[in-house]
Amino acid sequence: MPKKDRAQEAPSRDVPKPEEGQTICVVKKMLGGDHLVVLCMDGKERLARIPGKIRKKMWMREGDVVLVGIWDFQPNRCDILYKYGNDEIKRLVNENIISREVIDQLRG
């Protein structure tokens, strides 16, 4: 007897939102190794580092939207904390955390 067709729903996860010392950025250039140049919402270009625990799990490309944690002692450097997917970017736009124009402008 065949199984009944069940509606497949993707589990909805909470989208990480920027907290104190964090900002949303767009990957501008890959430098090699685990370093990237990112353009942040505050208009600054920062040198970002992919930490070891997410280096092999999360592949980066130019134009990806990421959440970064800014270093306290060097504000022009940061660590990648999370990479947003397309559906998560739409959810951020719907919640008015970031505007679509800003994303389009940062992606250039």
From Swiss-Prot:
Protein keywords? Initiation factor, Protein biosynthesis
The record describes the protein's role as: Seems to be required for maximal rate of protein biosynthesis. Enhances ribosome dissociation into subunits and stabilizes the binding of the initiator Met-tRNA(I) to 40 S ribosomal subunits.
Task: State the name under which the record lists this protein.
Answer: Translation initiation factor 1A
Could you tell me which Gene3D superfamilies the record lists for this protein? Nucleic acid-binding proteins (2.40.50.140)
Q: Which residues form the S1-like domain?
A: 11-85
> What HAMAP family does this protein's entry cite?
aIF_1A (MF_00216)
Give the molecular function GO annotations.
RNA binding; translation initiation factor activity
> By its UniProt entry, which InterPro entries does this protein fall under?
NA-bd_OB-fold, RNA-binding_domain_S1_IF1, TIF_eIF-1A, TIF_eIF-1A_CS
| Family, similarity comment | Belongs to the eIF-1A family.
Q: Where is the signal peptide?
A: none
